[in-house]
């Protein structure tokens, strides 16, 4: 019999979150961002929940081929563009749109022989300082692309560095507007945080929005706001079961390093889940967890294959009791992945992407 740990993906929740993104940015078309294998969920597992998207945005050609293999005939955007000249041939064959963020990519297009002109998104570095042309160089890059017979349509895009933070987006919006003024083509600047917080602003939603983490039920601005505050549903549940029970007395310690000491009699459950499954090792005593749908806490240090939970709120729980590490329990109770991530000093994005290959995954609506 296999270990009782299991990850469950919920395509219906993905669909719900996609529709929530649409409501946040009325009249804009939605790129469903499925990079990093749909944020660890599996592109094939969430595809049905995303069929209503206007396009798929991702990182590499292998992911694009997988989306096409699923029968998608609409737009697909390579968010980082091509990584070498020969990639352009496959872009043409698959009908991909791709970002252009540096001079080398323009040079590759200029040298590319094709009968199918490319549709590109010219990326501006408006303050993120990762990829893109600075505002001062943006128009000259646009002119170079516009002169190429290999390019059919040029759209404009940028990425916000602090859409969910105190600095905000006004300075980047202003830089983008100034550099793209009077240039033809569609616009795309809003990521998940921007579309939730500023999607009602026509200067932000523009023609396209990029829905990423919002699709997967995580709040981009947690802990200021929770996923439920945005009407987002959990799309991944990680669950296991209690495989052992211990009755502690005052002075007993738990786990490696004896980081927890019982102050009195205490029942604990040992759960078949550890950092080798993708659960964050930095989650110390007090991290929220659900046992039979009842909220309790972890006890002591997370080990490779196991962790301990406090059974005080669920005294009847024993061997085989359901443990929800994040997501939705059988009784409908929800433990947001963002809460677990915060306890581990990270973000929900990372936990989704870090789910270990040894964890079985099923799809359930």
Curated annotation (Swiss-Prot):
Binding of substrate, residues: 130, 304
Enzyme class of the recorded protein, top EC level: isomerase
Cofactor(s) the record lists: pyridoxal 5'-phosphate
Record's GO cellular component terms: cytosol
Keyword Isomerase: yes
GO terms classed as biological process: D-alanine biosynthetic process
Family per record: Belongs to the alanine racemase family.
Name used for this protein in its record: Alanine racemase
Taxonomic lineage: Bacteria, Pseudomonadati, Pseudomonadota, Betaproteobacteria, Burkholderiales
Gene transcribed to yield this protein: alr
């Amino acid at each position: 019999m296999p270990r009782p740990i299991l990850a469950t993906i919920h395509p219906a929740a993905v669909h719900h979150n996609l529709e929530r993104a649409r409501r946040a940015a009325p009249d804009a078309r939605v790129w469903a961002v499925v990079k990093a294998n749909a944020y660890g969920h599996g592109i094939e597992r969430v595809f049905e929940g995303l069929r209503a998207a206007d396009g798929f945005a991702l990182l590499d050609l292998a992911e694009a081929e997988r989306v096409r293999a699923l029968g998608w005939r609409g737009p697909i955007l390579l968010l980082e563009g091509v990584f070498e000249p020969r990639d352009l041939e496959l872009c043409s064959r698959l009908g991909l749109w791709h970002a252009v963020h540096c001079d080398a990519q323009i040079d590759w297009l200029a040298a590319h022989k094709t009968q199918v002109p490319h549709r590109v998104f010219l990326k501006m570095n408006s303050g993120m300082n990762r990829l893109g042309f600075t505002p001062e160089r943006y128009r000259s890059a646009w002119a170079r692309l516009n002169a190429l017979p290999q390019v059919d349509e040029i759209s404009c895009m940028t990425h916000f560095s602090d859409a969910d933070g105190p600095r905000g987006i006004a300075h980047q919006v202003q830089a983008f507007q100034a550099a793209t003024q009077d240039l033809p083509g569609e616009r795309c600047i809003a990521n998940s945080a921007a579309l939730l917080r500023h999607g009602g602003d026509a200067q932000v939603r523009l023609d396209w929005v990029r829905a990423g983490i919002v699709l997967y039920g995580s709040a981009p601005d947690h802990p200021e706001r929770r996923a439920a505050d945005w009407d987002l549903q959990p799309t991944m549940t990680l669950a296991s079961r209690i495989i052992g029970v211990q009755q502690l007395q005052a002075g007993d310690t738990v786990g490696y390093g004896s980081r927890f000491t019982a102050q009195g009699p205490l029942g604990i459950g040992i759960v078949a889940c550890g950092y080798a499954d993708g659960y964050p090792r930095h989650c110390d005593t007090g991290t929220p967890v659900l046992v039979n749908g009842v909220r309790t806490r972890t006890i002591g240090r997370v080990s490779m294959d196991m962790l301990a939970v406090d059974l005080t709120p669920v005294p009847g729980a024993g061997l085989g009791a359901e443990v929800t590490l994040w997501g939705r329990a059988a009784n409908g109770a929800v433990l947001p992945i963002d809460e677990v991530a915060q306890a581990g000093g990270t973000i929900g994005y990372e936990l989704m992407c870090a789910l270990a290959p040894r964890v079985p995954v099923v799809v359930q609506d």
